[in-house]
Amino acid sequence: MSSDKTQREEFEDSCRLHQATFPELEGAASLVRLYDGVPSFHDAEITDLNLRQAGGSSIRLCNLYPTAVDDGRVFVTIEIAHLIDVELDGYNHGQNVINALHVRPARSNAVRDTYRVEPGDLEIELFSILGLGGLLVGRGLKVGWTMDRRARNASKRPALLGQ
């Protein structure tokens, strides 16, 4: 599929779709509240990726707690009930850091015609900074998250005036 859009325009379109799609995922509303908006997952580290032919697959990210100072980490897991297609590249044994993670409606891909896109199918695109990047396509996405102790403590502090 040919496009006259620049890479930046494609990224911005993907970001808009992510902003609309992510909050609709099961379990995402509380994470959106924590981040006071849809998280971009900028500088998040991919800590775990489980791909299964049958049953659930998942990706786990370690993301900064949403404050101006280093107040701990939030661990986000996106479960994929039915994995349809995978296109990944660049795994690094030391660290896998992403610029962004976007969830958006799945698009047809003539180059990778291994599946037929159905309504409700979603793509998870990993925009790599270092290491793993690529695309996961699936159905039945669900979001879960936890915080480390520092982030839990930070979440109990009253917000500072002017911030």
Regions found by a protein language model. Name each.
Residues 1-163:
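Surface-exposed, interaction-prone regions used to assemble/regulate multi-protein complexes
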